[in-house]
Swiss-Prot record:
Superkingdom of this protein's organism: Bacteria
Enzyme kind, highest EC tier: lyase
Pfam families given in the database record: Pterin_4a (PF01329)
EC number: 4.2.1.96
InterPro entries registered for this protein in UniProt: PCD_sf, Pterin_deHydtase
Name the record gives this protein: Putative pterin-4-alpha-carbinolamine dehydratase
Length: 97
């Protein structure tokens, strides 16, 4: 089972990840894009990143917004290093449109 991050670990990570929050025991962020097409482009690329890590987000799309929620199912739905790595990868591709 992956190691669950402590509250202190999570607060440190949130200081590094712009716009992310700790909500309901998960890392969460809503991205806003210029159009539905840009939002879908991000989701497709994000899906490839998730597959590469074999770690998948909970997410939703409404027009130009994508809300991402990251927690590790194997760790009882808590935040682990896998979630942090995926959030960092999403940040690197979030400019994509």
């Amino acid at each position: 089972m992956p190691t669950i991050l402590t509250q202190a670990d999570i607060q440190q990570v949130l200081g590094e990840l712009k716009g992310w929050a700790w909500e309901r025991d998960a890392l969460e962020k809503t991205y806003r894009f210029g159009s539905f097409r840009e939002a879908m482009s991000f989701m497709v690329r994000a899906a490839f990143e998730a597959e590469a890590l074999n770690h998948h987000p909970e997410w939703a799309n409404v027009y130009d917004r994508v809300t991402v929620r990251l927690a590790t199912h194997d760790a009882g739905g808590k935040v682990t290093a896998k979630d942090v790595e995926l959030a960092r990868r999403f940040e690197k591709i979030s400019w994509v449109g």
